[in-house]
Structures are given as C-alpha cells and as structure tokens.
C-alpha cells in the first residue's frame, strides 16, 4: 500500500502535469503561425476556438477546438495509468491551465473545449450526454454559449445519476467555473443581445 506522502505527491504531480499541458495556448499559436496576428487583439480577446473563428478561418477554429479538447483528454488518459484520482487531478489541472495559462499572463479561454476533452478522457459516455445536450439546445435556440452552459450543467447530474460521485463532484466544480467564465455571455443572454450561431457581425 502506498504511503500517504507518496500518494499526495503523485496527485500534485498529476495536477501540475495537467496544468502545463492545458496551458498550451493553441488558439494563439495557430493564428500566429497562420499569419493572422494575435487573436487576443480581435473580438472578445479570448484564445479559444470561438474567437479564432472571428478571424474568418474555419479550419483554424476547428483545429483550435480539437487541440484544446485533446489537452484535457491526453492529460486524463496519461495520468490514468496511475489511477483514477491521478486522472481526475490531471484533468482538472488541464482545465485550469487552459483558463489561466502562465505563459500569457493567466488570461486563457472559457474552458468548454477542454471541459469536453477531460470528459472524454474520464467518462466518454458523459461526453455523449454533453454533445446531445449541446446539439438540442443549439437547434432550439441557436445560442452557442447557452448550449455550452446547458450541456455543462447536465453532465454532473448525469454522472451522479449513474453513481459516479467523484466525477460528478469534479464536473460540478468545473461547471461552476464555466458559468463564471461565461458571465458576460449570460448577461447578454438575459439582455437579448447575445449573438446567435451563424449571425453576421
């Protein structure tokens, strides 16, 4: 049986590993490599896929979305070799790293893609629930932000209903953070000024 000190050190190591991986700012890197400048200087100033899309390059936005998700998936799957607790720590670290990357002044994305990536790595069936909730909400409302919020809200409930309290707790915390990061979007939704999917400008 592992000593408590070793176990704690392993979890801290997994958290740090996840954070470093999650803090890679793919949106910023890809837009610069494509000669589109600093994505932080346009739109919302966010480094995530939605703001990258505002450059007009859909392929680059898709690549950003996939890579931001893979950060979470890779962190969780690699750390899973040391147990579920390590996987949870690494997944959470990747999520936090994406939100607050040390390399660019702790100003990162809103976390939805990495949230989904961590979910794929820890509970792929939960990712299907997320996708279904996102698609249904998007079809009904055409609000990308609302779709992400609803999907993230449904996930911990679904995980808890299947008896996975540890993962439900993790994603409940992550959902709260996602809501906090989307507070400007929530305000615009309430005011009726949030942009819809496919809207111009």
Swiss-Prot record:
It is a multi-pass membrane protein. The keyword Transmembrane applies. Pathway: Lipid metabolism; phospholipid metabolism. It is found in: Cell inner membrane. One of its GO terms (cellular component) is plasma membrane. The chain crosses the membrane at residues 10-30, 60-80, 86-106, 116-136, 139-159, 166-186. GO terms for biological process: phospholipid biosynthetic process. One of its GO terms (molecular function) is acyl-phosphate glycerol-3-phosphate acyltransferase activity. It is an enzyme of class 2 (transferase). Its EC number is 2.3.1.275. Probably interacts with PlsX. Belongs to the PlsY family. This is Glycerol-3-phosphate acyltransferase. It comes from Brucella ovis (strain ATCC 25840 / 63/290 / NCTC 10512). The lineage of its organism: Bacteria, Pseudomonadati, Pseudomonadota, Alphaproteobacteria, Hyphomicrobiales. The gene is plsY.
